[in-house]
From Swiss-Prot:
Catalytic activity: N(2)-acetyl-L-ornithine + L-glutamate = N-acetyl-L-glutamate + L-ornithine; L-glutamate + acetyl-CoA = N-acetyl-L-glutamate + CoA + H(+)
Gene Ontology process terms (BP): L-arginine biosynthetic process; ornithine biosynthetic process
Protein name: Arginine biosynthesis bifunctional protein ArgJ, mitochondrial
GO molecular function list: glutamate N-acetyltransferase activity; L-glutamate N-acetyltransferase activity
Family label: Belongs to the ArgJ family.
């Protein structure tokens, strides 16, 4: 039995995502301090300006970033790319981010504004070409430079930087727009010799989520010493398995950026691609990035479900990814998930029109499709298609139970190889239209 849309909307609104996903404490990398405030850019008076600083005096931090491939790249994206290109990722000691205004499609004046923001932070820390700039908010509006400039000066002049939990949480809040909760995670890890290091991640995003070689806005910082070129390779690999595998609505922003700073405050050898711990650290960063990316989907605008789309036993990874992404972006699939309708035909249709690189990846006689319950209830797997044959006698009651879960999985077994890709998506509700229908107001 399907639940009425009115009840579904009510359920979505009553889920307290803040309590579920926002930590109450954390561990943070050595040698970083952060600050944030309400500069007045946001109409609601919430925090809208934040800065991350490397305060490790013994070593400048290295940086890496992955940016949107949208042709209308925002001014802060272009300025940050210039900083990284000019420094080769070395000696980048700060990130400044604002919310409420994207500074996108603002022409040469927008570029000048972004450069002034970076230059102002550079002047405060006494280093040139050392600051990355990030912005999020409404496209087509210039930064209110008087408010941003005053806010930056206030943070430095009043020495508002801290390394405690509240400082980091407030930083996460300062980049939120339509987010229902700030996204902050942190964890300690060990190298093979027992040396401990820390990763902290912050991201924002709830809509305009369908990245390609980038993400929404996100920072990952660590106190490990990592060679700049290695850091870039590590971040790119992590993003390809995390932030490039999420979808809320199929839209790719003009401002999508994820960056990583490594300041070497932990006293250990510099990690490069020849280091014995390289693969371990790379794997840890990737798994950490997956956790951070999944929070964005959990906060999808109006979403009531978090859905893992798992495509396995594919002839190659690229086609597994293409199929997972196509299912995740399908408005019909997402609408069926919201309505708790076991309409497997929409899933199969999405698989069928996927633009595969190798047609041999899809053999209609070998494909299996299932719904998977994630709450340990039984039966865990509900088979919808078995070796290309529809299961006409599926248990509709069990299907409704699985589709009513806040977390569930769509499993697609291609039967043509051994490669696997996971995508994370959400359903599409009436609330999504409401939120985006009056975003500028």
């Amino acid at each position: 039995m399907r639940v009425s849309s009115a009840l579904l909307q009510k359920a979505a609104k009553t889920v307290d995502k803040y309590s579920l996903y926002v930590p109450k404490s954390g561990v943070f990398p050595k040698g970083f301090k952060v600050a944030s405030l309400a500069s007045g850019v946001k109409k609601n008076g919430n925090r809208d300006l934040g800065i991350i600083l490397n305060t490790n005096k013994s070593r400048p931090s290295n940086a890496a970033a992955v940016f949107t491939t949208n042709r209308f790249k925002a001014a802060p994206v272009l300025v940050s790319k210039q900083v990284l290109d000019g420094s080769s990722g070395e000696g980048v000691n700060a990130i400044v981010a604002n919310s409420g205004c994207a500074n996108a499609v603002t022409g040469e004046l927008g570029m000048q504004d972004a450069q002034k923001v970076a230059g102002q932070v550079n002047a405060h820390i006494g280093k040139e070409n050392s600051t990355l700039v990030m912005s999020t908010g409404v496209i087509g509006q210039r930064l209110q430079m008087d408010k941003i400039s005053k806010g930056i000066n206030t943070l430095f002049d009043q020495k508002q930087f801290g390394s405690d939990f509240n400082s980091w949480l407030n930083l996460a809040k300062s980049i939120c727009t339509t987010d229902t909760f700030p996204k902050l995670i942190s964890s300690k890890f060990q190298l093979s010799d027992g040396t401990e290091y820390t990763l902290t991640g912050i991201s924002k995003g709830a809509g305009m989520i369908c990245p390609n070689m980038a993400t929404l806005l996100g920072f990952i910082v660590t106190d490990l010493p990592i060679k700049a070129s290695t850091l870039q390779a590590m971040l790119t690999a992590a993003v390809n398995r995390s932030f490039n595998c999420i979808s809320v609505d199929g839209d790719m922003s003009t401002n999508d950026t994820i960056c990583m700073l490594a300041n070497g405050a932990v006293d250990t050898f510099v990690i490069d691609e020849a280091s014995p711990d390289f693969e371990q650290v790379k794997s840890q960063v990737t798994e950490f990035a997956k956790q951070l990316a999944q929070l964005v989907v959990r906060d999808g605008e109006g979403a009531t479900k978090f859905v893992t789309v798992n495509v396995k036993n594919s002839a190659n990874f690229k086609d597994a990814r293409i199929i997972a992404e196509t299912i995740s972006n399908s408005m019909l699939v997402k609408s069926a998930l919201y309505g708790q309708d076991a309409n497997w035909g929409r899933i199969l249709c999405a698989i069928g029109y996927s633009k595969l690189e190798n047609l041999a990846s899809l053999d209609e006689s070998k494909i299996n499709v299932s719904f998977i319950a994630t709450d340990n209830s039984s039966p865990r797997e509900l088979k919808l298609i078995a070796n290309g044959v529809p299961q006409f006698d599926i248990d509709e009651n069990r299907a409704s139970e699985i589709l009513a879960l806040p977390d569930l999985e769509i499993l697609v077994d291609m039967g043509t190889g051994s490669e696997e890709c996971q995508f994370w998506t959400c359903d599409l509700s009436h609330e999504y239209v409401t939120i985006n229908g009056d975003y500028r107001s």
